[in-house]
Amino acid sequence: MKIGIVCYPTFGGSGVVATELGKALAKEGHQVHFITYSQPQRLDFLNENLFYHEVNIPTYPLFQYPPYESALSSEMVHVAQYAGLDLLHVHYAIPHASSAYLAKQILASQGIRVPVITTLHGT
């Protein structure tokens, strides 16, 4: 399978879980595409089954906060089209699941069906 994984790239629990899951899936022969704003800390190598796609977050002087959700959705759409993803697995509801929902709707309007799995993390 070609799997997109969206996670926070930090050393925190969800980032560790998502990265280790992706590495294990790649070891089993799946193609895994990490989509996030920085290369995950525990993703210390890339190979023929492991890819990293950086979310480019534009800045606008009129916005107090950068539009990360829009940029993330856009990158998910791009990777799904480019890599032919079979599945998106997002970790965390906000902003990842909401961005995945938007990306799924954009892809559906183009006749592309990509199922989304959300893993909720929290303390």
Predicted regions and their residues:
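A conserved mid-protein helix/loop that constitutes part of the nucleotide-sugar donor-binding site
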Residues: V16, E20
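N-terminal strand-loop element at the rim of the active site
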Residues: C7-F11, K23-P67
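Extreme N-terminal starter segment of soluble prokaryotic enzymes
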Residues: M1-G4
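Glycine-rich, highly charged phosphate/nucleotide-binding loops
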Residues: P66-E75
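A short, histidine- and acid-enriched strand-loop-helix "catalytic/donor-clamping" loop
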Residues: V114-T123
